[in-house]
Amino acid sequence: VKAWTPIEIDALSEILNLGMGTAAAALSRMTGCEILLSVPSLEFTTRNSVTTKLKQSTETRLVAVREPFDGLISGDAFLLFPEHRSLEIVRAILKETTPEDTLTEVAREALCEVGNIILNACLATLCNMLKES
């Protein structure tokens, strides 16, 4: 994994924030509610490291959405949510109550769709910026 400078990470975070804005607009249209998203943290790591971190996560149960990508750049993008936040997102999308402590199959599919919307918007914004430079 390439070592990124703080300036490069800041620039990429700004690009991803633009993608998050696009994703937030799409999710707002889906839910009929204003959705605000930001890039809380950005980390470059290997797939094995992500898997290890997910298995070792004991403080908060996490839900992950993975989006492989190929083209100008290739890799896997992971979007991680604390499980309780993922249930909030699903409730907003499905406009129904999901059990407090469980992700049903429909809820999992909805969360995957939300993750795909967010990750695709971010990756598309990144690719568009790379094509322009």
Say what each PLM segment does:
Residues 1-133:
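Composition-driven recognition of glycine/serine/threonine/acidic- and proline-rich low-complexity segments
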